[in-house]
Amino acid sequence: MSLQVLNDKNVSNEKNTENCDFLFSPPEVTGRSSVLRVSQKENVPPKNLAKAMKVTFQTPLRDPQTHRILSPSMASKLEAPFTQDDTLGLENSHPVWTQKENQQLIKEVDAKTTHGILQKPVEADTDLLGDASPAFGSGSSSESGPGALADLDCSSSSQSPGSSENQMVSPGKVSGSPEQAVEENLSSYSLDRRVTPASETLEDPCRTESQHKAETPHGAEEECKAETPHGAEEECRHGGVCAPAAVATSPPGAIPKEACGGAPLQGLPGEALGCPAGVGTPVPADGTQTLTCAHTSAPESTAPTNHLVAGRAMTLSPQEEVAAGQMASSSRSGPVKLEFDVSDGATSKRAPPPRRLGERSGLKPPLRKAAVRQQKAPQEVEEDDGRSGAGEDPPMPASRGSYHLDWDKMDDPNFIPFGGDTKSGCSEAQPPESPETRLGQPAAEQLHAGPATEEPGPCLSQQLHSASAEDTPVVQLAAETPTAESKERALNSASTSLPTSCPGSEPVPTHQQGQPALELKEESFRDPAEVLGTGAEVDYLEQFGTSSFKESALRKQSLYLKFDPLLRDSPGRPVPVATETSSMHGANETPSGRPREAKLVEFDFLGALDIPVPGPPPGVPAPGGPPLSTGPIVDLLQYSQKDLDAVVKATQEENRELRSRCEELHGKNLELGKIMDRFEEVVYQAMEEVQKQKELSKAEIQKVLKEKDQLTTDLNSMEKSFSDLFKRFEKQKEVIEGYRKNEESLKKCVEDYLARITQEGQRYQALKAHAEEKLQLANEEIAQVRSKAQAEALALQASLRKEQMRIQSLEKTVEQKTKENEELTRICDDLISKMEKI
């Protein structure tokens, strides 16, 4: 997941925090109005956070078939999946998905600087030690913990010279950050600080100084100068990349982090583990710097007793410091040589692990995590003491040569982890720890509050505990030598939790310690054949790992010296053990839940590696120098096979626990990445909404401007219309005045007409009265005439009636005469008839 800062106004100019603390820190007010809602403002990082930087891990990979170094373009072709049994492909293939996650996650080391000295916390972050093999040369201040905390990421906190004097940090200073946020941050940081693949080897960087300068592109220097602060530009010019300030700009006598840093865990994919930052003490006035390592080797018990000081401080001469600085600056590119350190009698210097080119210097890490770890330390010590007192202490870690580990048979008491297979996941030799390690540890006593319980244990015990599910487990080693005095003192320190201190954690003034300074003229290389004899043959490897292989662990361990091609032409100095752990951690992190019986990544330490053998660095004597003492080697190789098998079982249990914890932390990191992606989506959506709102507002403004222009034109036309209307109004006014005049004249006419009407009315009344009189007279005359006519009619009617009665009487007379005539006629007729008859 990568958090890309969206706007520079939310980012300060000081790019000194690259951790995940911004997820838990409250947002700060920028003084500007924000376009985000209240719910969206919580998703924006605070102002004082730096931009996210992608760190690329550019240690060259090798092709599985040709074993050639791959270019960055060819390395991307190895992402093809391989079968579970394809251990060769798993060994040589760098998990790109892990690398991509590491590029996205913010990488930060809790480093504190005091006068240019990198200070580390006393309690080590050993959560991801993985298969930290027991055979591991923890010489005086040369190893910082079991399995060698790999590639101490101190370079990310380089400090400018001008600010180095102002960085004195008190050991008891505690930040106000919440413990829960810090623990989750530490867990996510420890998970992604993985180690380089098993196919990569460590190379003596002094021989590749010129090659690194030739291969480093010019753009890297320019990029480094551009990205680092002003105080770290000098450091970038010398190395081509951002070198650690503790190496490039340290005062004379200061030891670089590679001088006593832990061997990197080579089996886990991804980048190297970062060592936690620690508390610091003042630097001595003589300009020298002493580095404290809590875990020291047992062969120091043979040295004078004045070597027993708090933390096994070691002081380098200026010549050695310059050589170490050259190694630190040149160890960032190219393959590195794998070397084994079995000469524990002398103090050995760590070969610098591969430098990651993508890191930037000049970043000051926060000071919160170290203080929280100091608070967590007493609880972890009490839990560890309870474990060591209840159960038996695991025996000495065994040197695993070449074997195949079957997880199903781990519970079988007769199972031998070394049997049968010649392939190995990791191989180391763990020298017994010095019995005087517990003496003079003021910082450890301050951090671990409770008194330690004293119980006897075997020769070498490895104690592992975890304070809580979120606390970082601390691997604690307690060893004893075969001598009687060493055994007696180791019993007192077997169950005591020792704080794991990384290089530069507690510089103690040299005038307070009795250990003499390390001189390079005392270092020499001696052929193992001169010490152990030539009885070990090549065919003796066939018996390695079998149940009958019990008689000579000394001869078995001598094979590492006799047949290791890396030690054939190695320089005459005790070289550190390069830890090659298996990739069980990387294989177990697959989301499909790979079963327990998955094979380990197989790496043959006895096979020839096709890499150039570098020559001795400057200031190191030639192989022909004085021989080394053989006592520490013999003491180391006298451990029995049973002890080695027991330690293998303990280491496997530790690996199971660490693997499950790594899976849990990996899941948390993935969830955190999803959350950050959602945060980014919310911010992007908010910005898109703001952009859309701006576009809409612009469109509305354009529309309003157009409306304004339209209204202006309408107003002009309305003014013209109003002027025309006003002219018409003036004309109408004149017309109305004419109407008023006409009305007055009409009123006069009406008055005249009314006067005439009244006069005519009067005349009408007069005429009406005259007509009425005449009508009355006419009516009277008509009545008289009518009465006369009626009288005359009555007279006429009476005369008519009289005449009608005369007519009726005459008619009756006529009728009677007629009847009489008829009767006379009939009588006559009768008489005539009768007369005729007669």
UniProtKB/Swiss-Prot annotation:
Induction info: Up-regulated in various cancer cell lines.
Modified residues (Phosphoserine): S25, S39, S71, S175, S177, S250, S317, S402, S434, S558
Assigned GO CC terms: centriolar satellite; ciliary basal body; cytoplasm; cytosol; Golgi apparatus; intracellular membrane-bounded organelle; mitotic spindle; spindle pole
Segments for region (Disordered): 123-227, 311-527, 569-594
Pfam name, any one: TACC_C
UniProt feature, compositional bias: Polar residues: 492-503, 579-591
Chain positions with N-acetylserine modification: S2
GO terms (BP aspect): cell division; cerebral cortex development; metaphase/anaphase transition of mitotic cell cycle; microtubule cytoskeleton organization; microtubule cytoskeleton organization involved in mitosis; mitotic spindle organization; nuclear migration; regulation of mitotic spindle organization
Cellular location(s): Cytoplasm; Cytoplasm, Cytoskeleton, Microtubule organizing center, Centrosome; Cytoplasm, Cytoskeleton, Spindle; Cytoplasm, Cytoskeleton, Spindle pole
Entry-linked InterPro entries: TACC, TACC_C
Region (Necessary but not sufficient for spindle localization): 522-577, 594-838
Major subcellular location class: cytoplasm
Entry keywords, A to Z: Acetylation, Cell cycle, Cell division, Coiled coil, Cytoplasm, Cytoskeleton, Mitosis, Phosphoprotein
Chain's role: Plays a role in the microtubule-dependent coupling of the nucleus and the centrosome. Involved in the processes that regulate centrosome-mediated interkinetic nuclear migration (INM) of neural progenitors. Acts as a component of the TACC3/ch-TOG/clathrin complex proposed to contribute to stabilization of kinetochore fibers of the mitotic spindle by acting as inter-microtubule bridge. The TACC3/ch-TOG/clathrin complex is required for the maintenance of kinetochore fiber tension. May be involved in the control of cell growth and differentiation. May contribute to cancer.
Quaternary structure, from the entry: Interacts with microtubules. Interacts with CKAP5 independently of clathrin. Interacts with CKAP5 and clathrin forming the TACC3/ch-TOG/clathrin complex located at spindle inter-microtubules bridges; TACC3 (phosphorylated at Ser-558 by AURKA) and CLTC are proposed to form a composite microtubule interaction surface. Interacts with CCDC100/CEP120. The coiled coil C-terminal region interacts with AH receptor nuclear translocator protein (ARNT) and ARNT2. Interacts with GCN5L2 and PCAF.
Family: Belongs to the TACC family.
The protein's name: Transforming acidic coiled-coil-containing protein 3
Record organism: Homo sapiens
Lineage: Eukaryota, Metazoa, Chordata, Craniata, Vertebrata
Gene: TACC3
